[in-house]
A protein has these predicted regions:
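C-terminal motif of bacterial Sec signal peptides marking the signal peptidase cleavage site
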Residues: 27-31
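Extended ligand-binding regions for polar small-molecule ligands
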Residues: 33-37, 81-90, 152-163, 229-270
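Ligand-binding clefts/hinges and TM-proximal coupling segments of bilobed small-molecule sensing domains
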Residues: 34-39, 167-185, 248-309
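Extracytoplasmic small-molecule ligand-binding "clamshell" domains
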Residues: 37-119
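Periplasmic-binding protein-like
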Residues: 63, 133-141, 206-248, 266-286
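Short helix-initiation/N-cap motifs at beta->coil->alpha
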Residues: 96-109, 178-192, 226
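A ligand-binding cleft/hinge motif common to bilobed small-molecule-binding domains
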Residues: 106, 119-127, 196-225
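Flexible hinge/capping segments at coil-to-helix
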Residues: 130, 140-157
């Protein structure tokens, strides 16, 4: 589906189960303390002929791309899942999730979904919405007022053999890189003051830090942003209109931000971050940046650590 999320597909979902269980346990327990409330069901804005199943929005997600979507105890959970649920509710429809992997074209032709979440590419074969999320490899620091390093002695932690580590080596040099087995270790070292920064995908990094209760803030971009959109068949004009209108309502009403904050904590918009442009080790082959597994930072080793705890 996209470079970063393809890397996520190589990550063991076992590593994320502990994080998902903890997050959802808090949500469930919080709900138990409040009075039950059932909102009035909205009228469907799409006719039966516009959908594969009358009254149901079939949504394709990549269930190997945590924290956007991942299997946990038999359910698919994540940011894209929550946004899809909000979209379905706004359209007056029930939600049905389908794990379609990263192939958008086959999702429509073989899985019979109405929309697909988390699409980065554009194609004449399908329509895409305006972006609803964005990500990039960034530098995290313990203090939000921290600037990106320009000289002197500093250390940046990044997951071993990841695109984040490659970016650190490219922009600052190998002497400033501390390779870590997983992002959990990297953020714990940041919290302990053993490193000055952590380099990681903005979404994955924020998710791990937030789940661990560690204060870490993105302070600089190490690459251009990637935007994530919703796709549907190019011939499905009614669905396109419904997605456009519903997504706009959710964005203007702050619902997307609430969902992001639930999973990631409050974050500085990437558009507000400065871009590091210095390069000390220009790459010989740009394609190397797209072929590294593990660039999104959560590994099976990290999951084993969580299980032991």
């Amino acid at each position: 589906m996209n470079t970063c999320r393809k890397a996520c597909s190589n990550v063991s979902i076992k590593a994320l189960v502990a994080f998902f269980v903890a997050v959802f346990a808090v949500v469930v327990l919080s709900g138990c303390a409040s009075q039950s409330y059932t909102p009035e069901k909205k009228q469907s804005i799409l006719s039966a002929s516009a959908l594969h199943t009358d009254g149901v929005l079939r949504v394709g997600v990549d269930a190997s791309s945590a924290p956007y979507a991942a299997q946990s105890q038999g359910d698919i959970m994540g940011i894209d899942v929550d946004i899809a649920a909000a979209l379905a509710d706004e359209m007056g429809l029930k939600l049905e999730l389908v794990d379609v992997g990263s192939n958008v074209d086959s999702a429509f032709s073989q899985e019979n979904v109405d929309i697909v979440m988390g699409v980065e590419t554009t194609s004449t074969a399908f329509w895409t919405s305006e972006p609803y999320m964005e990500s990039a490899i960034v530098l995290f620091a313990s203090d939000p007022s921290t600037s990106a390093p320009t000289s002197g002695s500093f250390t940046i932690a990044a997951q071993l053999s990841s695109m984040s580590a490659w970016q650190v080596n490219d922009h600052f040099g190998e002497e400033h890189l501390m390779s870590e087995a997983d992002l959990k270790s990297a953020f714990e070292d940041l919290q302990a003051g053993k490193v000055n920064y952590v380099a990681a995908d903005s979404t994955i990094g924020a998710y791990v830090a937030h789940s661990l209760g560690i204060e870490a803030y993105p302070v600089a971009l190490l690459q251009d942003k990637t935007e994530y959109r919703i796709a549907c068949p190019s011939t499905a004009s009614a669905v396109q209109t419904a997605v456009t209108n519903s997504l706009t309502t959710l964005q203007r009403g702050g619902i997307i931000t609430v969902i992001e904050n639930k999973w990631l904590g409050e974050m500085t918009p990437l558009s507000n971050l400065p871009r590091v442009t210095t390069t000390v080790n220009p790459p010989e082959n740009d394609s190397a940046t797209t072929n590294e597994a593990g660039s999104n930072a959560v590994t099976a080793d990290e999951g084993d650590d969580e299980d032991e705890e």
